[in-house]
């Protein structure tokens, strides 16, 4: 279980958060085909393309400039993914960003926002570790931030670990045996989100 995080106070600014989201967009652009390939094991093979639609919409909005603070920025991100990405990924990432936006109405603490983001994921039903979802990345990353030990290598480790888990959520359940040995596409895109966070300097050991 995620513990209370007030001991860790990584405070975001609008500038670093913009950089974080911009780097996330770049990673989705570069890795669209790879994410699609991962998604082919489930069926449609369009996770990368879907995520990129939301990312491009957000990129255009960021280019127009933003009047407001962190809450406004993440609300804008949430609406881009809900309105443009489509499918389960759009709803999940949309709720992640909207819940983070709500957290930023109270303070700019990174851990508070990530805790709220996890609650956004859980909006669609309780999800535990080792169920082959982005939670398998999100929760251990939060633990590493709390303990000041997060690295790019660890993020990749958490993404890769989903190969060994049996799918227990969504339509992946119906082809769970076929997915053995395959990385979860949602976990992979979540990995890019946290890689972008590190590269943006949001989290500082």
Ranges and model annotations:
Residues 2-205:
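N-terminal loops that bind phosphate or other acidic moieties
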């Amino acid at each position: 279980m995620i513990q209370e995080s007030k001991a860790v106070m990584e405070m975001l600014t609008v500038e670093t958060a913009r950089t974080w989201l911009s780097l996330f967009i770049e990673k989705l652009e570069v890795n669209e085909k790879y994410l699609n390939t991962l998604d082919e094991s489930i069926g449609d093979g369009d996770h990368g393309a879907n995520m990129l639609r939301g990312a491009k919409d957000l990129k255009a909005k960021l280019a127009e400039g933003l009047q407001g603070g962190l809450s406004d920025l993440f609300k804008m991100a949430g609406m881009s993914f809900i309105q443009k990405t489509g499918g389960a990924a759009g709803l999940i990432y949309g709720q992640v960003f909207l819940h983070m936006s709500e957290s930023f109405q109270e303070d700019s603490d990174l851990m508070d926002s990530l805790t709220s983001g996890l609650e956004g994921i859980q909006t669609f039903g309780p999800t535990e570790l080792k169920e082959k979802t982005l939670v398998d990345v999100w929760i251990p990353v939060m633990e590493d931030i709390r303990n000041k030990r997060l690295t790019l290598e660890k993020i990749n480790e958490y993404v890769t670990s989903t190969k060994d888990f049996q799918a227990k959520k969504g339509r992946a359940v119906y082809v769970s045996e076929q997915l053995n040995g395959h990385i979860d596409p949602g976990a992979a895109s979540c990995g890019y989100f946290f890689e972008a966070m590190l590269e943006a300097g949001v989290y500082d050991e």
